[in-house]
Swiss-Prot record:
Cofactor requirements of the protein: Zn(2+)
Domain of life: Bacteria
Protein name as annotated: Peptidase T
Reaction catalysed by this enzyme: Release of the N-terminal residue from a tripeptide
Annotated signal sequence range: none
Entry similarity comment: Belongs to the peptidase M20B family.
NCBIfam families in the record: peptidase-T, PRK05469.1, PRK13381.1
GO annotation, biological process: peptide catabolic process; proteolysis
Keywords for the protein's UniProt record, in alphabetical order: Aminopeptidase, Cytoplasm, Hydrolase, Metal-binding, Metalloprotease, Protease, Zinc
Length: 410
């Protein structure tokens, strides 16, 4: 199993599937369709049935039931795209066998070092096989580890018919990282009663709560005048943006929050005297606090527009997804069965809220309750991203055990 996981994973991460928020297409980048087509071929090769990919890059396939019992159809999902935070082009995965607990030099020329001083959780991986970047790209374990684990689990079940299971559906979706994954996902065609995203982090993670999420695009329209004659005429759009940000509570940012604490996050700010643009994301687990955060953003925009004149501040505020706990708690047994599967494999479940989002958050609101299971990766979205091969083995085994337990309990 280890060899197959390593071979598939290192193949998939070399396909550049970074999504693009500026694109209106679906998928937003051609690399995602390239990987989708690769997976379609491989799904057919291992013996999956009803293998399809649509024009938008959604891959679906079926592993038929091998039991006479009436077992609910379950699904496993992972996303094709990688994050926009750092390039996913020319990923060169590095394999470090029998990790010794010391610094790992990712890139000598650029002096990029993965160090337990900065990332103390590395101590958990002594003796393990780590797959890292070369220090110039992200790795793409988010979520190609999940894709790999689903592929290997399905191949294992096909080759081990003694493990009884109901009908299993798998899906690989585009553009999750920019919040569009479920937009064109056909829940009815997928046909599962419950599903799981393999999109979590370290070993044991199990999540069924997510942020409520919104995005705020703000355009500041200034007035550029020659600085020599600018008195009482110039309006500096960049300074307007800075003034806007000064109204955001500085301790309510990602770098100062954890657990159930929400935040405002300034993703980007660019512009000049004439015009500046800022993009914030707004996150909170509590719906009332989420609404209050959006109201605060809107009130700052209104206040500044009143100060600088009509049309000086333009705000576009849109909800992205909601906390999936509301949709999963009524069917909490689907979380409990994963906890049982993990314990059967000597994994201690670590149930915590997702300080982020998965396709499962939106899918749960489309009628498909979808908790999130660990994929094994650490330090997602950056050059220090890595995954332990042994964690990928465990995630694969969890998929297999969940399928077995669903059949056993009927």
């Amino acid at each position: 199993m280890k060899e197959e996981l390593l071979k598939r994973f290192t193949k998939y991460v070399k396909v550049d599937t970074q999504s693009n928020e500026e694109s209106k297409a679906c998928p937003t980048t051609p690399g995602q369709m390239e990987l989708a087509n690769i997976l379609v071929t491989e799904l057919k090769e291992i013996g999956m049935q009803e293998v399809t990919v649509d024009e938008f890059g959604y891959v679906m396939a079926t592993l038929p039931s091998n039991t006479t019992k009436e077992v609910p159809v379950i699904g496993f999902l992972a996303h094709l795209d990688t994050a926009t935070d750092l390039t996913g082009k020319n990923v060169q995965p590095q394999v470090h066998e029998n990790y010794d607990g010391k610094d790992i030099v990712l890139n000598k020329d650029l002096n990029v070092v993965l160090s337990p001083k900065q990332f103390p959780e590395l101590a958990d991986y002594n003796g393990k096989t780590l797959i890292t970047t070369d220090g110039t790209t992200l790795l793409g374990a988010d979520d190609k580890a999940g894709i790999t684990e689903i592929m290997v689990a399905m191949n294992y079940l096909i080759n081990h018919p003694e493990i009884k299971h109901g009908k299993i559906r798998v899906a690989f979706t585009p553009d999750e990282e920019i919040g569009r994954g479920p937009e064109r996902f056909d829940v009815e065609a997928f046909g599962a009663k419950y599903a799981y995203t393999m999109d979590g982090g370290p070993l044991g993670e199990l999540e069924y709560e997510s942020f409520n999420a919104a995005g705020a695009k703000i355009t500041f329209n200034g007035n550029s005048v020659h600085p020599g004659t600018a008195k009482n005429k110039m309006v500096n759009a960049v300074k307007m943006a800075m003034e806007f940000n000064a109204h955001i509570p500085k301790d309510e940012a990602p770098e100062y929050t954890e657990g159930y604490e929400g935040f405002y996050h300034l993703i980007s700010l660019n512009g000049d005297v004439e015009q500046a643009k800022a993009y914030y994301i707004i996150r909170d687990f509590d719906h009332l606090k989420f609404v209050e955060r959006k109201t605060h953003i809107a009130s700052i925009a209104k206040e500044l527009e009143e100060k600088y004149g009509e049309g000086s501040v333009e705000l576009k505020l849109n909800d992205q997804y909601y906390n999936m706990r509301e949709k999963i708690e009524p069917v909490k047994e689907i979380v409990d069965i994963v906890s049982a599967a993990m314990r059967n494999l000597d994994i201690e479940p670590k149930i915590s809220p997702i300080r982020g989002g998965t396709d499962g958050a939106q899918l749960s609101y489309k009628g498909l309750p979808t908790p999130n299971i660990f994929g094994g990766g650490e330090n997602f979205h950056g050059k220090f991203e890595y995954v332990a091969l042994e964690s990928m083995v465990k995630a694969t085994e969890v998929i297999i055990e969940v399928a077995r337990l669903f059949e056993e309990k009927e």
